[in-house]
Amino acid sequence: METNVWKFIWKYLKQVKYIFFILLISFSIDEAVQPLTAFLVSKIVGVISENNAQNIEFMTLGKNLLVLAIIMFIGDISNTIRRYIEEVKFKPYFQTKVSVDLFNYVHKHSIRFFNEEMAGNIIAKVNNILNSLVEIYRDVTFGIIHPVVTILLSVFFIALESPLLAAIIFVFEAIVASLMIITRKRITPYSARHAKLFAESEGFFVDGVTNANLIKSFGNFSFERLNFYKLLKKTTNALRAESKISSLLDSLTSFLFDTIGLFMFIMAFVWWYFFGLSTAGVVLVITLSRGMSYSAGNLAFMASFITKAYGQIKDGLELLAKPCEIEDCEGAKPLKVKKADINFRNVNYQYNGQPKLLNKFNLEIKTGEKIGLVGHSGAGKSTLIKLLLRFYDVNGGKIEIDKQNIAKVTQDSLHKSIAYVPQEASLFNRTIMENIRYGSTNASDEEVIAAAKKAFCHDFITELPNGYNSKVGERGVMLSGGERQRISIARAILKNAPILILDEATSALDSMSEKYIQQSLKELMKGKTVIAIAHRLSTLKEMDRLIVMENGKIIESGSHKELLKQKGAYYGFYNLQSEGFINTK
């Protein structure tokens, strides 16, 4: 994604350049009405002032009035067309296109990105970009085109009366406007800091709402409130600093704004007194003075608003548009799984210069083999799973599925070939039907219900007031841990992928649920290559082979019975079992 702010904006503007061009033309016509009106009014005043009531050229007066009416009518029509195109054609498409692209790119980021960044912060950055894009469009059209058209036409009409006067006014106005624009650039760093802290505050707020149960259960509301207050205080101080410099610059702009009007007023009378400027010319300059001074001031104000919006977009893109850690390689092809054998070949992995978690790790998993991973926390079990899912990339060696390097295939095809049941079930705040169907988005209701029955969650679902149409709440909080996990397993059953990964998939289940689930897992695992991280003996006994890991290395390998006979590390875990769980602590 483009990280340069102006290139980012132009990328989307050029997709609607014809609509944008029509908008600019209609806006220019609309803004030309004011100086044209002033010019015609001065002509009408000239006709009246140069003749008495008996000698007024009513034909000339009538023509000017007719032209004035036509111009005002054209301005109204142009304004109506502009508003329609802007609100119906331009803004909806513009914002929708940017929203879709941001959504797509954000979801290309690695799991590490989402683990390290607060969800609320990401959302705040997206909102800042979308809102600031609209502000920049508005400020460029209204804040720049409006004053430019007004100033140029005003100078042109004054030049018809006196070219020298027009030149003097134009130069003075250009100097003052430039001075205002330059001084307002000082607000940029203040705006950027405020935008950054505001996003952090919003992220903290969302994080607190997401974890409301945790805050209440630990009685730590006062602690969270204090932390939020500290962050909010920093944000408020940044806003004060921004507002302070902005207020000073606004005062300076207003002063210069009035200076332009006063200068034009004085010059009109000087030219009238010394150089014979007509009464109509004086009226013209005075009438245009307010519009020109307002336009010059508007240029400065809008320069500051654009700078602020620029800072917010820049801040957002620095996070959201950073290069993706995990990307499909050039020419990546879809993964084709026929057998589903898996090979880890001399795999090395470490993160940010830390000690290696895996060093020349080798493991071959045959087609349809069920592998159980056992070991202390930090032994490397979860790392293996994340590398196989390509949540992270290996630092050396390779991982193959059916002799295809997973780094050379598309991530989408890789993930569609693997059904993953994590320790903590992830559910959307949607209906149970939608959550299970996520395993196969085209599945019928009957197929969803069949999967739910195999996962032994059909009975508790039908007991809910709305059955399969019941909402599960934020992250599934309306359900118990065991119920959430059974829905997660039903989703994996529906997906029916050739490779199955179980990451403590039954750890959250009570003994009765676990009894039913073990039977459904037997059906689920048939004909699939399975990798399971498990501590339940009932799960481990079903594995064809157990891999005991320590410090990223395999220290034992064999079936449950074989490893017990060896009386090694697994035997030690087994002897420390408690209530059906082996102790790996």
Language-model-derived ranges and their functions:
Residues 83-87, 105-152, 210:
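Juxtamembrane loop-to-helix connectors within ABC transporter transmembrane domains
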Residues 15, 19-29, 74, 139-193, ...:
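Transmembrane helices of ABC transporter permease
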Residues 50-52, 157-171, 245-314, 319-320:
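Helix-loop-helix
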Residues 20-78, 160-164, 279:
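Transmembrane helix-loop-helix hairpins at lipid-water interfaces of multipass membrane proteins
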Residues 14-15, 111-112, 128-137, 141, ...:
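An intracellular "coupling" helix at the cytosolic face of ABC transporter transmembrane type-1 domains
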Residues 18-39, 64, 68, 86-87, ...:
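Alpha-helical segments in transporter systems
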Residues 329, 335-585:
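ABC-type nucleotide-binding domain
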